């Protein structure tokens, strides 16, 4: 009889200890809550059905209510990255720090500059950055693409230099004198007007050279 009572008391004591530990554990768990701001053209009640709230890439997960609010329960102390998983909009992830006393501190997640702290208000308010794009927009043809192509630049730049350089030399006597002192060989610059006329109007007829023969060249010597 005594052994039965002793066994019963041990069972009751073990269950009570387990219940106390569970109570202490649940008392140290917290909730992450906030609100989602969508564009005015989108109905939140329909959008919320396919949206999920992920903490640390799915370690803890919550759902979005029809009024665009959310709450993730039973979250222990630590640092978490809050993300909104959906197929329609792009949201920036937010970092949330939960202290042992239950104090929530939210800030922007800056991977490139971790020392840069931009605090955010709590409860969270997440705004859509823009619609999600799964395809790259097709590039349109523009006239500037043709004008700045390498082939066009190779043709236009030398032509511009040929037209501007003689005018600059004629208007600046000092530059013209320096060019003459350099004793550079004179290069006949082509006439642009004549070149264009030959290109569009056809080439000018070639001049016939007079052929004269000597009197003694065609006769045989005797």
Curated annotation (Swiss-Prot):
- Keywords, sorted A to Z: Membrane, Signal, Transmembrane, Transmembrane helix
Question: On the Extracellular side, which residues?
Answer: 17-145
Which domain of life does the protein's organism represent? Eukaryota
Q: Name one GO cellular component term.
A: EMC complex
Q: How does it sit in the membrane?
A: Single-pass type I membrane protein
Signal peptide from the UniProt entry: 1-16
Q: Name one Pfam family in it.
A: EMC7_beta-sandw
Instruction: Show the stretches that span the lipid bilayer.
Output: 146-166
> What broad class describes the main subcellular location of this protein?
membrane
Outline which residue ranges sit on the Cytoplasmic face. 167-222
Name where it's found. Membrane
Family under the similarity heading: Belongs to the EMC7 family.
Provide the protein name: ER membrane protein complex subunit 7 homolog
State the organism named in the record: Caenorhabditis elegans
């Amino acid at each position: 009889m005594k052994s039965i009572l002793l066994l019963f008391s041990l069972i009751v004591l073990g269950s009570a200890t387990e219940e106390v530990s569970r109570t202490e554990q649940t008392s140290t768990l917290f909730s992450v809550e906030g609100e989602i701001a969508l564009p005015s053209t989108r109905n939140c009640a329909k959008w919320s059905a396919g949206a999920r709230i992920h903490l640390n890439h799915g370690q803890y997960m919550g759902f979005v209510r029809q009024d665009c609010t959310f709450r993730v329960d039973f979250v222990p102390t630590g640092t978490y990255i809050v993300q909104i998983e959906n197929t329609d909009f792009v949201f920036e992830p937010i970092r949330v720090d939960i202290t042992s006393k239950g104090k929530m501190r939210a800030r922007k997640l800056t991977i490139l500059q971790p020392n840069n702290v931009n605090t955010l208000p709590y409860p969270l308010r997440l705004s859509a950055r823009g619609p999600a794009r799964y395809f790259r927009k097709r590039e349109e043809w523009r006239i500037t693409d043709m004008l700045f192509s390498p082939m066009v630049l190779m043709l236009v730049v030398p032509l511009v230099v040929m037209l501007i350089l003689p005018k600059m030399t004629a208007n600046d006597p000092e530059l013209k004198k320096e060019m003459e002192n350099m004793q550079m060989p004179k290069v006949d610059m082509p006439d642009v007007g004549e070149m264009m006329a030959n290109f569009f109007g056809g080439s000018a007829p070639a001049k016939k050279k007079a052929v004269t023969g000597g009197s003694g060249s065609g006769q045989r010597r005797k």
